[in-house]
């Protein structure tokens, strides 16, 4: 058995099974290597979407940097074998400045770069991340940082936008109307998870504070908003407000829809509310879809 010098890293590697590289016969320079993806012949079908998923990259949501999870895709003609996937991240890097700004205009420019680099007509992106914002306690007005989950979806064909979507997931308080009605005092309440997927008009300018308007529709219609910091006067106000505004899951999604339907820059929306029931072992949920 060969003895290795265990005082060196290389010796320890070989002691644990590493071997020297072989003398290869295939090309080692890029220009000499076969580019299978660029093979051109009849491959029977064109592909609508091909790309990468779960790409984690820094993003900027308003003034905060956070981690974004991306899915990028392009089309592929039937006479091309595949895409050069490394060009996707190269396209992203051209727009990187301490993060990719999560705004539709920035994502549109990324997709236009992707189209050019991939030499394809269609391109799309979905990216999700945490949205952080200032949240003030309702009575003492103490500032802290709240958060919600946002997902942007955008697709283009040529220079035309074919898909423009924003999804927000936020947590709220819901107090049970039935419990309030039948009980001598108090009522059970729980945390509700509200998800709103909006379909944004592709031909109309969107308002500047669109995220805040959607979030306000989600939170203001609940029994109460959630706050990072609550002092005793705040807790009293939150508790009493919830009791004053009882909501079933059915009530909440209908009230949210009534606000969203007034936004002329939306073509439609999907709403789901899921209550993590405090007196059951199961959750309660309701869903609603609307198209103008």
From Swiss-Prot:
GO MF term set:
GTP cyclohydrolase I activity
Query: Keyword Transmembrane helix, does the record have it?
Result: no
**Pathway annotation from the record:** Cofactor biosynthesis; 7,8-dihydroneopterin triphosphate biosynthesis; 7,8-dihydroneopterin triphosphate from GTP: step 1/1
Cite the EC number. Answer: 3.5.4.16
Q: Give the superkingdom in one word.
A: Bacteria
Q: Which Pfam families match?
A: GCHY-1
Task: Name the site position(s) for May be catalytically important.
Answer: 176
* Catalytic activity line of the entry: GTP + H2O = 7,8-dihydroneopterin 3'-triphosphate + formate + H(+)
The biological processes this protein is annotated with in GO are: tetrahydrofolate biosynthetic process
Q: Which UniProt keywords apply?
A: Hydrolase
Q: Do the record's keywords include Hydrolase?
A: yes
Q: What does this protein do?
A: Converts GTP to 7,8-dihydroneopterin triphosphate.
**What protein family is recorded?**
Belongs to the GTP cyclohydrolase IV family.
Q: What is this protein called?
A: GTP cyclohydrolase FolE2
User: What is the originating organism of this protein?
Assistant: Staphylococcus aureus (strain JH9)
**Gene that this sequence comes from:** folE2
């Amino acid at each position: 058995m060969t003895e290795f010098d265990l005082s060196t890293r290389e010796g320890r590697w070989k002691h644990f099974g590493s071997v020297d590289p072989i003398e290869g016969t295939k090309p080692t320079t890029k220009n000499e290597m076969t580019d299978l993806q660029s093979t051109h012949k009849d491959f029977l079908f064109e592909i609508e979407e091909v790309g990468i998923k779960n790409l984690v990259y820094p993003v900027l949501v308003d003034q905060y940097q956070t981690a974004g999870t991306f899915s990028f895709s392009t089309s592929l003609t039937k006479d091309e074998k595949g895409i050069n996937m490394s060009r996707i991240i190269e396209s992203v890097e051209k727009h990187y400045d301490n993060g990719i700004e999560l705004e539709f205009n920035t994502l549109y420019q990324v997709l236009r770069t992707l189209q050019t680099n991939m030499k394809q007509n269609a391109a799309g992106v979905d990216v999700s991340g945490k949205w952080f914002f200032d949240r003030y306690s309702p009575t003492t007005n103490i500032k802290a940082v709240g958060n919600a989950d946002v997902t942007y979806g955008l697709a283009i064909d040529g220079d035309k936008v074919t898909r423009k979507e924003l999804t927000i997931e936020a947590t709220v308080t819901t107090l049970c109307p039935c419990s309030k009605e039948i009980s001598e005092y108090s009522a059970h309440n729980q945390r509700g998870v509200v998800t709103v997927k909006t379909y944004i008009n592709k031909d109309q300018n969107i308002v500047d504070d669109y995220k805040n308007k959607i979030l306000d529709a989600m939170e203001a219609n609940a029994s109460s908003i959630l706050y990072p910091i609550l002092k005793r006067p705040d807790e009293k106000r939150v508790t009493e407000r919830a009791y004053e505004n009882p909501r079933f899951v059915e009530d909440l999604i209908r009230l949210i829809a009534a606000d969203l339907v007034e936004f002329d820059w939306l073509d439609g929306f999907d709403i789901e509310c899921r209550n993590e029931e405090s007196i059951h072992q199961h959750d309660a949920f309701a869903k609603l879809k609307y198209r103008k």
